[in-house]
Amino acid sequence: MKRKSILFQVAIIFLLSGCVSTQVGSNIDAGTIGVDFVFQKENMCFGTSPQITLTHLPAETKGLKVSLRDLDHPGADHGGGDLKNFNASIIPAGALKGYQGPCPSMSEHRRFHYVFKVEALDETGKVIAFGQGMKECGWVDFQ
């Protein structure tokens, strides 16, 4: 019984260390970016990307890599985009050309969790800062 407990603890450590290392890639010194956004009706399903407000964006930023994830459906790809020669604190609505917005099922009367992940890149493409912002929404929010 004790052996199973130790194996379980080792497995948890490996899982957690994997989560930590994948958040900022290989650049452990990356800073933290604040990420905020609001989903509107026009951002749903295959609409346009929402405006995204960033704080603490490093002055050395030369580009951004942005992706949208659905925490309730990890395999779902909601796209995002790469913004080259970009270092502004506001990503305008519609700027993410690969965006496929959240499209919660009308038959499920619950809320879903969506995360925008933003990586700031320097002139060499190295990640110099990372941030993410989460919102929850359901179909009823957009009727």
What are these regions (language model features)?
Residues M1-F8:
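Bacterial N-terminal signal peptides that target proteins for export
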Residues K2, L15-L16, S26:
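Intrinsic low-complexity, intrinsically disordered segments enriched in polar/basic residues
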Residues Q9-S17:
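Bacterial N-terminal signal peptides
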Residues C19-Q143:
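N-terminus-centered regions that define maturation/targeting leaders and the start
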